[in-house]
Regions:
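N-terminal Rossmann NAD(P)H-binding glycine-rich loop of SDR-like oxidoreductase domains
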Residues: 4-24
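Rossmann-fold cofactor-recognition segment
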Residues: 45-57
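NAD(P)H-binding glycine-rich loop region in Rossmannoid oxidoreductase-like domains
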Residues: 55-94
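NAD(P)-cofactor binding segment of oxidoreductase domains
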Residues: 67, 86-113
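Conserved Rossmann-fold NAD(P)-dependent oxidoreductase catalytic core, especially the SDR/UDP-sugar
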Residues: 75, 100-142
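Conserved catalytic Lys-bearing alpha helix of Rossmann-like short-chain dehydrogenase/reductases
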Residues: 96-102, 146-154
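NAD(P)-dependent short-chain dehydrogenase/reductase
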Residues: 155-210, 216-220, 225
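C-terminal substrate-binding subdomain of Rossmann-fold SDR/epimerase-dehydratase oxidoreductases
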Residues: 199, 204-206, 211-264
Length: 264
């Protein structure tokens, strides 16, 4: 990678990934792609190029790729799980239609594409322990359906057109840099904000509901290393399972009470 376009650079992952890439590739163009009304601010805006790139607008993607001689696209545009359920049509338009636009530009311009998948792509029939790489998925949310579709569409573009597509299936991501953005696992970040503000936290999950999580720096490393890997050694491209830790709301709340005894 040398010149990279990050679509969705102001989102939860994109904010930190853009800066990490600029540190990793100081001599390249790491372009922060944003949508109107969500322009980059602070160090993201000050430390490198930016371009308005709405993933539903294929021409904007192509223009940014041409202008900055982009060789790799990180497609991070998506509605997160809880938000997607409230807006299923928009979730499909961004998650699948936007990916199609990105893959078409990549096919025409010779770019590699990273599009994250998720544990949300799994369903009730998926083995919970030591989940196999290749297994039944069958998600029952629009978010998960768009992720499975994205995995298959990316694989198709690799087989059919030779586009270099790669991905990992992220668990819930924990970050203090960007605020939560509507994901089911975002309670694990929201709960700390409530504790600091002295508020009572209303958790959307029942005690005993364990979910896989990952600290953002580990997720960024996975996203970069998969794109740097020798393609000849990749058994799977879309998508590798990655995990880090698992906990339920009680574990977090009990730990918070060690520092904030009155937290509820």
């Amino acid at each position: 990678m040398k010149n990279v376009l990050v679509i969705g650079a102001t989102g939860q992952i994109g904010t930190e990934l853009t800066m990490r890439l600029r540190q990793e590739y100081p001599n390249g163009n790491i372009v922060a792609g944003y949508i109107k009304g969500a322009e980059p601010k602070g160090i993201v805006a000050e430390s490198g190029p930016m371009a308005e790139v709405d993933i539903t607008n294929a021409q904007q993607i192509a223009d940014a790729v041409e202008k900055y001689h982009v060789d790799t696209i990180y497609n991070l545009a998506a509605l997160l799980s809880a938000t997607a359920e409230a807006k299923p049509q928009l979730a499909w338009k961004i998650g699948v239609g936007g990916l199609y636009n990105t893959l078409e530009v990549a096919r025409e311009k010779g770019c590699a594409v990273f599009t994250p998948s998720s544990i949300g792509s799994f369903g009730k029939g998926t083995p919970r322990d030591h989940t196999p790489q290749d297994t039944i998925q069958r998600p029952d949310t629009i978010y998960g359906i768009t992720k499975v579709t994205g995995e298959m569409l990316s694989d198709y573009y690799t087989r059919r057109f030779g586009v270099d597509t790669r991905s990992v299936r992220f668990p819930g991501l924990i970050s203090y840099v960007a605020p939560p953005g509507g994901g089911t696992t975002d309670y694990a970040v929201d709960i700390y904000y409530s504790a600091v503000r002295g508020e009572t936290f209303k958790c959307p999950l029942k005690p005993g509901t364990f979910m896989d999580m990952m600290y953002m720096p580990d997720a960024l490393r996975a996203a970069i290393e998969i794109m740097e890997a020798n393609p000849d050694r990749l058994v799977h491209r879309n998508s590798f399972n990655v995990t880090s830790m698992s906990f339920d709301p009680e574990i977090i709340s009990n730990k918070i009470r060690e520092y904030v005894p009155d937290f509820k």
